A protein has these predicted regions:
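Active-site beta->alpha N-cap acidic-glycine motif
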Residues: 72-179, 183, 187-200, 204
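Structural recognition of the beta-strand scaffold that forms the well-ordered cores
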Residues: 112-115, 139-143, 164-169, 205-209, ...
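Short helix-capping segments at alpha-helix termini
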Residues: 135-136, 198-201, 225, 288-293
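Alpha-helical scaffold elements lining the catalytic groove of polysaccharide deacetylases
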Residues: 172-199, 213-264, 280
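Catalytic grooves of carbohydrate-active enzymes
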Residues: 258-299
Length: 312
């Protein structure tokens, strides 16, 4: 029994010695580390050089749409004085005929009358007045009643500088002739009232229907108020910018139309209200016209009747 115990003890000692030997690192050895999966090898890709043959898809650049063409600006009005000298003989036939409703289209003499409608305009009317003064020319201004009320200083200046004032209705209704007689009469009387308030010594001897839409009834009522009805012989259509454009193209159109159509005795229609191209065109037209024609304001007639009651 004792022998067996001794043998077992020997084996236990041998086992313990083996365990102790395994737990110590060997000389020059390293402490083992946990094993991990190796990182995949990455082969760097070189950027293609210009010499490398590669198929590169072409990319069309995105082109922004072109901006819209700017609207033509009115030509800048020159401040240089206009020279209206010289004299050129002309042999064109005298203007004749009558307008709608028996209205006048000519002056009844070889003289030419320039007329400016729809004002007074606080911006453009002073400019055309300045041009007329530089050339020593008188004209006729067919003014709208409510604009005469709102710009009395312009009416005062027109009269003071020797131009003729013309009634162009209260608010430029194209269908004025279709209104009843009482309305038409009040419309014209109130327009005269505003003109005479600003220029007490003036005479309102003429009437022009809005759009030239005369009827015999309209002509008759104007006559009863002491006014002759005037149409025109030359219309450059300076108001039709939708057809003729704006800026330089309109200026050139106005000049060409007036020079082509004017005759001795012509009444020429133009517009000062909101028409800067017309003002620029007359810097060229005034010297051209004055060299060929006598330019007049339509002559005054007896004083207009006293204005009636205001419009309701």
């Amino acid at each position: 029994m004792q022998r067996r115990i001794a043998v077992v003890a020997v084996f236990v000692m041998i086992a313990l010695a083996a365990c102790a030997s395994a737990s110590k690192p060997s000389a020059g050895g390293t402490t083992p580390t946990p094993t991990s999966s190796p990182a995949p090898a990455v082969t760097p890709t070189a950027a293609p050089s210009p010499s490398m043959s590669m198929s590169v898809p072409s990319v069309s650049p995105t082109v922004a749409p072109a901006p819209p063409a700017p609207k033509p600006a009115p030509p800048a009005a020159s401040t240089k004085p206009i020279s209206c000298t010289g004299e050129i003989a002309q042999t064109r036939p005298v203007a004749s005929g009558t307008g709608p409703g028996g209205s006048l289209v000519s002056t009844g003499s070889p003289a030419v009358a320039l007329t400016f409608d729809d004002g007074p305009d606080p911006i453009n009317t002073p400019k055309i007045l300045d041009e007329l003064k530089q050339c020593g020319v008188k004209a006729t201004f067919c003014v709208v009643g409510f604009r005469a009320r709102d710009n009395p200083e312009m009416i005062t200046r027109i009269a003071a500088e020797g131009h003729t004032l013309c009634n162009h209705s209260w608010q430029h209704l194209f269908d004025l002739a279709k209104r009843d007689d009482a309305y038409i009469r009040k419309d014209l009387e109130n327009t005269n009232k505003m003109i005479l308030r600003a220029a007490p010594g003036a005479r309102v001897a003429y009437f022009r229907a809005p759009g030239g839409n005369f009827t015999t009834k309209l002509v008759k009522i104007a006559s009863e108020l002491g006014m002759n009805s005037i149409y025109w012989h030359v219309d450059p259509r300076d108001w039709e910018s939708a057809k003729f454009g704006k800026g330089t193209v309109m200026v050139n159109h106005i000049i060409a139309a007036v020079e082509r159509d004017v005759r001795p005795g012509s009444i020429v229609l133009s517009h000062d209200n909101g028409k800067p191209d017309t003002i620029v065109a007359y810097r060229t037209l005034l010297p051209w016209l004055k060299a060929r024609y006598t330019l007049i304001a339509l002559p005054d007639a007896p004083p207009s009747p006293a204005p009636g009651a205001p419009l309701p």
